[in-house]
Amino acid sequence: MSSGLVLENTARRDALIAIEKKYQKIWAEEHQFEIDAPSIEDEPITMDSEELHRTYPKFMSSMAYPYMNGVMHAGHCFTLSKVEFSIGFERMNGKRALFPLGFHCTGMPILACADKLKREAELFGKNFDNVPAEEEEIKEETPAEKDHEDVTKFKAKKSKAAAKKGRGKYQFEIMLQLGIPREEIIKFADAKYWLTYFPPLCESDCTSLGARIDWRRSFVTTDANPYYDAFIRWQMNKLKAAGKIKFGERYTIYSEKDGQACMDHDRQSGEGVTPQEYIGVKIEALEFADDAAKIIDSSSDLDKSKKFYFVAATLRPETMYGQTCCFVSPTIEYGIFDAGDSYFITTERAFKNMSYQKLTPKRGFYKPIVTVPGKAFIGTKIHAPQSVYPELRILPMETVIATKGTGVVTCVPSNSPDDYITTKDLLHKPEYYGIKPEWIDHEIVPIMHTEKYGDLTAKAIVEEKKIQSPKDKNLLAEAKKIAYKEDYYTGTMIYGPYKGEKVEQAKNKVKADMIAAGEAFVYNEPESQVMSRSGDDCIVSLEDQWYVDYGEESWKKQAIECLEGMQLFAPEVKNAFEGVLDWLKNWAVCRTYGLGTRLPWDEKYLVESLSDSTIYQSFYTIAHLLFKDYYGNEIGPLGISADQMTDEVFDYIFQHQDDVKNTNIPLPALQKLRREFEYFYPLDVSISGKDLIPNHLTFFIYTHVALFPKKFWPKGIRANGHLMLNNSKMSKSTGNFMTLEQTVEKFGADAARIAFADAGDTVEDANFDESNANAAILRLFNLKEWAEEITKESNLRTGEITDFFDIAFEHEMNALIEKTYEQYALTNYKNALKYGLFDFQAARDYYREASGVMHKDLIARYIETQALLLAPIAPHFAEYIYREVLGNQTSVQNAKFPRASKPVDKGVLAALDYLRNLQRSIREGEGQALKKKKGKSAEIDASKPVKLTLLISESFPEWQSQCVEIVRKLFSEQTLDDNKKVREHIEPKEMKRAMPFISLLKQRLANEKPEDVFERELQFSEIDTVKAAARNVKKAAQALKIAEFSAISFPYGAKTGKDIFTGEEVEIPPVTKIVENAVPGNPGVVFQNI
């Protein structure tokens, strides 16, 4: 539970929750969210899907279905809210909007936890009460009434001392810490129990949020639902038949001790770690340094006629032209290993990996012939392939580690910040490092040009970050990321055979050239440490496996074509997908342990969890017709059993063939299934966290283009950032964590939904602020109370709408309606909330204050429109207002989204903004007039009556107009940022006032449309506006007693002007600075005691 905001008085929240519960029940009874395709009776099966969509508009969105090893938390809810808001909005656009949600159970976490509990029950009894003595300090927490956390990922809140004592050591202890009663825990030793326990909780939690989910279409994955099981078998068979699933050698995390692949469930640490591919660069030793030569010469086991290669692991083969030396660690013990026709010099750990990758004479043999301390190699003369320098030296680098790569690092100071700063350090202190200056004194060779950092990326970034030493580890890590990203995405080769090509294109070509020339080879190791449960430090081995051939060229082209046609909502998302599509290769499709579907042609394997979750959205379209419960136990309305769902039947549904020869399913039933699919597909948008781009979402694209006709390829993907809670990372261990259930219990559904909408819409991390949720409770409750009271109010005005503030309020409502619509359409829910609630309510507040007595028709429209604008985000509140306050007989869920009642008059809105700014200026001027200056009294005596005078300029000063023209000219020539050119157009005597004004114009151009900046003529009559709102202007002052109010209109620079109320010519008050600053749209404000 979050240790954040504590709610003192919950009466308002409880009143809103009562409304929410009431309408959730009504919506369920009305089957509001059960959305069907047009029936075959309505439209014949022969109607093309595109025509069907034109006649009956639809929208389908989904999120990555949650994993059933716990309940949903606020982070899940943030993703869910994006689907929710889009579904709510599209319903109001007249579309059949479908939001289905399933329950993912595939994989190892559930079974691994269940098996742990089985073992612990054997050790400690079914009640887990025979714990060894040293564990008896474990205390059972008082069970919470409902507190179902993700029990496979819990981090107990314990001190270091408690941790050392073993608290949380066993799975049953984690369950106890979560508040699950001891006597209930044994049930979780059966993996099936998890599948019955968590899905109903997920449904009830989502329902409590008011989610518009069609629960008829929900299901669990794995063979626990035989229909979904048949669907995944069909998917696997189709992919295999299409040549997308293959069998062969694949780089795999492997435990030598266990003699088998080490999958996630077998790991003590390193879950999710995959093989990292490097290029092993063979750097030939030409002449060993004396100390190394003595050791090598003294060994009779070495064949001196063979070549010796230092093997450097690199991710950047395209930079090899710029090698200036090669680094080893003076403190690492290196081995000289038999590599067949040559010797490799590397760490034993690296050669162990190589020995399982067909890179050595004998699999699994990695004993060194000779070991040599790294410092003995310093000064060794070498030849680095592709380098512009034929001879280089081995030099020391203290930051090289033995647990990453090969312990040998090739030096490219042009593009590696680490190499650049180390080279610089060696040059400054050669005596300290025991090297000769000429060994390091090589000119840095520019290899590629980048847009931001020029030809020497590393040097530029090191200087930008002010990195002083190789010991600046954090800065160097940051610099390395920047350098790699800039080089890869913006770099162009300026050296070598691929000069002029983009780095991302040249990279693989250089790699292929080096491998073909025998200068390098592909080498893999775990991307970070993986420890097996047996305590083995795992390696990477080439193993025979079934795998999906992602990255295959023709398939990849299809995936790219699909991506190009998608709406992705943010350029960063497209960049991320393009990066993944560039590197993603084959992926193991199966495992031997866990829950899931058996591989149809090799049933000792299970389809792994990322492979059975790629096209489940298509299964949503037909699920409700096949079964009535999550598990497929109860046959659905079409009377089709799971064993009738053959591959041939799925082929018909998903339009791979037009008839089914071998089935006893009636044709009308088959047609109904096909109709549901062809109506709701393609999926309009899939919404997930951005962390799923490298796997789940990319697999989603690949599998869709492989299995469905082009017209059914997905139309959009939205990736959101992670959710923070109160500006801190969500974490169970710190207590800064909330489940979906807790969020709704604490704030109610609508207030929570408003806080989720306000959290953010970009791919950057968002923030759920509890204070915003709490403020939403007060805002909604007060709005509800006001709406109830005002609709009973008998003193509201009626008749024609002619008053300025009536007209302005109507136009402002219309403008905000259109802005809100636009932001919903763009899926910018934070902005939709701003315009549709905060600004809309502020418009009402200003109207209420300005008008004196409000107009009944406008207030009725405001209340209805407010309910409709909020309906996608806060549907319970909207429903209450729509039905109970306004008396509508139908649901707001079926209402149309409001649109402007008439074209928006921009002049009226400009006049309204003018008045607001004028009132603000009067209050600010009042504050200045009352402020006591040093050694003097205030300009105005607040105890005496005051005259307020507005000085309304009819024209702009000539010098400003000239500045505007200068800016317009330079802006069109794209030279406005050149201050020298700006100054050339300004007379010296005008410089002092012109430059700040031009700076202001430049700032406006950065945030506004150019035409709005350059067009200075007002869209309204300033004089008419002041006359119409004279009473309001006079009341703007708060501390002063305004006894008289006048307004003088005058041409800029004149000494006299016209009183706009009497028409008399009058003198302008002698307030030089105020008069000079007055321009059209920004009058001067003068206070005088009378």
Curated annotation (Swiss-Prot):
InterPro entries: aa-tRNA-synth_Ia (IPR002300), Leu-tRNA-synth_Ia_arc/euk (IPR004493), M/V/L/I-tRNA-synth_anticd-bd (IPR013155), RBD_LARS1 (IPR055416), Rossmann-like_a/b/a_fold (IPR014729), tRNAsynth_Ia_anticodon-bd (IPR009080), Val/Leu/Ile-tRNA-synth_edit (IPR009008)
Pfam families associated with the record: Anticodon_1, RBD_LARS1, tRNA-synt_1
Sites of N-acetylserine modification: 2
Modified residues (Phosphothreonine): 142
GO CC, one annotated term: cytoplasm
Entry's EC annotation: 6.1.1.4
UniProt KW Aminoacyl-tRNA synthetase keyword: yes
Keyword field: Acetylation, Aminoacyl-tRNA synthetase, ATP-binding, Cytoplasm, Ligase, Nucleotide-binding, Phosphoprotein, Protein biosynthesis
Annotated localization: Cytoplasm
Keyword Translocase part of the UniProt annotation: no
Source species, domain of life: Eukaryota
UniProt-recorded Gene Ontology molecular function terms: aminoacyl-tRNA deacylase activity; ATP binding; leucine-tRNA ligase activity; sequence-specific mRNA binding
Motif ('HIGH' region): 66-76
Record-linked PROSITE patterns: AA_TRNA_LIGASE_I
Motif 'KMSKS' region, residue numbers: 729-733
Binding site for ATP: 732
UniProt GO BP: leucyl-tRNA aminoacylation; regulation of TORC1 signaling
Reactions that this protein is recorded to catalyse: tRNA(Leu) + L-leucine + ATP = L-leucyl-tRNA(Leu) + AMP + diphosphate
Family affiliation: Belongs to the class-I aminoacyl-tRNA synthetase family.
Other noteworthy facts: Present with 158000 molecules/cell in log phase SD medium.
Name by which UniProt lists this protein: Leucine--tRNA ligase, cytoplasmic
Organism: Saccharomyces cerevisiae (strain ATCC 204508 / S288c)
